[in-house]
Structures are given as C-alpha cells and as structure tokens.
Amino acid sequence: MATSAAAVQDEPATKFAKDQLKAIIERIERLEEEKKTISDDIRDVYAEAKGNGYDVKALRTIVRMRKQDANERAEQETILETYMQALGML
C-alpha cells in the first residue's frame, strides 16, 4: 500500500517534469528552425552580393574580422605578415 501511495504523490512532480521537458524540447526545436531560416537568409545575402559582383570570400573574411576585438585583429595581422615575410610572399 505504501508503494501506491508514493506513486500517487510522485504523479504531480512527474507531470511537471514531463511538461517542463516537453517545453524545453519545443523551444529548442523552434530556435533550430529560426537558426535555419536565418542561415538561409544569410546565404541569400551572400548570393545577392555575388550577383552584384562582390567577392563572397572577401566579404566572409571581413565579417569574421569585424567580430574580432581590434587588438586581436592587429595581432592576427602581424602574425600573418610575419609568416608571409618568412615565406618570401611580401
């Protein structure tokens, strides 16, 4: 009898946990769909830029560089220049 009484007491907690888990999964799925939509939009913008004669690889590099801190970007450029000089590319 104690087992069935414990099961009855756990039901609201179990239902809450199931509902919470379902809500979390649904939020993740919704965000994944939004991420896919945004990714498609970004791809369309790059295609538009390419259609207008812009170099997509250069645009991607600029976008990546703009995300960096100015000091980090300067350090990366210095390292790149050092390597290029060592290889006789400058």
Curated annotation (Swiss-Prot):
Care to name a GO molecular-function term for this sequence?
DNA binding
InterPro entries attached to this UniProt entry: GapR-like (IPR018753), GapR-like_DNA-bd (IPR046367)
Identify its protein family: Belongs to the UPF0335 family.
HAMAP family in alphabetical order: UPF0335
Instruction: Name the NCBIfam families on file.
Output: PRK13694.1
Q: This protein is called what?
A: UPF0335 protein RPB_1426
